[in-house]
């Protein structure tokens, strides 16, 4: 019969596997065996590719077999090159993080992803074949000699690919070949629990913004329907040469307008000090819509440079099939430039084709789907555990009865 402690131990193992099975530790070392980069995270990849019958989506995870590609990774050389972490998996897949630093901070300046369209496991019936690559800057950054920590999902949009890092712990330019105990928390997590701003200062992260409904109408009717809450993260240098990051909520009192055209739908939100443009586009076959550009013009009265202009025209966020609506309850963080990023909360949006001023069929974001998988997986594990304990009990009972048989 099973030992009394076995079911409890089995349950702990099952839950531990569910919580940490997807994460992996990647370490880059110099020629002396000293670690200079450490990264621990799980990753998922959302890719749009073309087939003979239009666009298709492919979603896959960073496998447990992924490992550091030492030939492409490096600790860098001072004043010559910067540290690089390259992770290899599958047949030709590469995820590369290029680091850089200044006097006070280090960052992942660029993320590069190479994928293999000849891999039929992930890209069935792809029109194009071979290795393709995309890259983008990121807002992964931390103070020197501190660990970058982010419990929230980090999304990096790279053209037709979105890379999502989860439960990330990253540090480059290591001092003692290990993660620092001091952390810099990502903006998605909010301020660090140990960070207490001076009492006269307003909090760095305000309450969540209000969900606002937007409607853009053209000559042929409604071309954009949206319900979402928006928050702008602005980093700038004040007149006293102090660098600050502020989170500013879009208010229901701000003026909203927009325009419709066959290939671009624009939503403009204007306040006293800022003009925010969100531009939606379509893919080549006009089967998908997505947020392709975010542009901000802002006046900053207390800044060294009083005006801020930021734009990114190569985004691929908030994407769904034309005629359907994109919906995501999870907060999304859209990186625009190193000075500006946009947080989107509780979003539902539909562009180009809107029937009867109502949202079409819903396409949920990957993050919401992942959140549902955890309770389902835990429930499945517990059900399996109950079955195992029941079988062990019945086997033990049968053996006990066998011991009393007449000889």
Swiss-Prot record:
Q: Which GO terms describe its biological process?
A: establishment of protein localization to organelle; lysosomal lumen acidification; protein stabilization
List keywords of the entry alphabetically.
Cell membrane, Disulfide bond, Endosome, Glycoprotein, Lysosome, Membrane, Signal, Transmembrane, Transmembrane helix
Q: Which residues lie on this side of the membrane: Cytoplasmic?
A: 396-407
Q: How is it modified after translation?
A: O- and N-glycosylated; some of the N-glycans attached to LAMP-1 are polylactosaminoglycans.
Q: The organism sits in which domain of life?
A: Eukaryota
Function, in words: Lysosomal membrane glycoprotein which plays an important role in lysosome biogenesis, lysosomal pH regulation, autophagy and cholesterol homeostasis. Acts as an important regulator of lysosomal lumen pH regulation by acting as a direct inhibitor of the proton channel TMEM175, facilitating lysosomal acidification for optimal hydrolase activity. Also plays an important role in NK-cells cytotoxicity. Mechanistically, participates in cytotoxic granule movement to the cell surface and perforin trafficking to the lytic granule.
Q: What is this protein called?
A: Lysosome-associated membrane glycoprotein 1
């Amino acid at each position: 019969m099973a030992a009394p402690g076995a079911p409890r131990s089995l349950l702990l193992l099952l839950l531990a596997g569910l919580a940490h099975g997807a994460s992996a530790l990647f370490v880059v070392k110099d020629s002396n065996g000293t670690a200079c980069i450490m990264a621990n995270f799980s990753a998922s990849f959302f890719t749009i590719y073309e087939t003979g019958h239009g666009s298709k989506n492919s979603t896959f995870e960073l496998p447990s077999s992924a490992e550091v590609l030492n030939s492409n990774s490096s600790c860098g050389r001072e004043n010559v090159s910067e540290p690089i972490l390259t992770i290899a998996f599958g047949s030709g897949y590469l995820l590369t993080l290029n680091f850089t630093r200044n006097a006070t901070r280090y960052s992942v300046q660029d993320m590069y992803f190479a994928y293999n369209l000849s891999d039929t496991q992930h890209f069935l019936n792809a029109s194009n074949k071979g290795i393709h690559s995309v890259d983008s800057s990121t807002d992964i950054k931390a103070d020197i000699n501190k660990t970058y920590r982010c419990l929230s999902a980090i999304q990096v949009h790279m053209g037709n690919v979105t890379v999502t890092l989860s439960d990330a712990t990253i540090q480059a330019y290591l001092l003692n070949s290990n993660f620092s105990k001091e952390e810099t928390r990502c903006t998605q997590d909010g301020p660090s629990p140990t960070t207490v701003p001076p009492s006269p200062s307003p909090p760095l992260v305000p309450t969540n913004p209000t969900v606002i409904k937007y409607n853009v109408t053209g000559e042929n009717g409604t071309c954009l329907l949206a319900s979402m809450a928006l928050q702008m993260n602005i980093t700038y240098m004040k007149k006293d040469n102090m660098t600050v990051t502020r989170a500013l909520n879009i208010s229901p009192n701000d003026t909203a307008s927009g325009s419709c055209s066959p290939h671009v739908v624009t939503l403009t939100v204007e306040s006293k000090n800022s003009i925010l443009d969100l531009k939606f586009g379509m893919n080549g076959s006009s089967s998908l819509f997505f947020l392709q550009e975010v542009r901000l013009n802002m006046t900053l009265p207390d800044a060294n440079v009083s005006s801020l202009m930021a734009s990114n025209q190569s985004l691929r966020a908030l994407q769904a099939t034309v005629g359907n609506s994109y919906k995501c309850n999870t907060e999304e963080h859209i990186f625009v430039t190193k000075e500006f990023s946009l947080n989107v909360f509780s979003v539902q949006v539909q562009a180009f084709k809107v029937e009867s001023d109502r949202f079409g069929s819903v396409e949920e974001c990957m993050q919401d789907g992942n959140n549902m998988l955890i309770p389902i997986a835990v429930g499945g594990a517990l059900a399996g555990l109950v079955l195992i304990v029941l079988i062990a009990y019945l086997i033990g009972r049968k053996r006990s009865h066998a011991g009393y048989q007449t000889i």
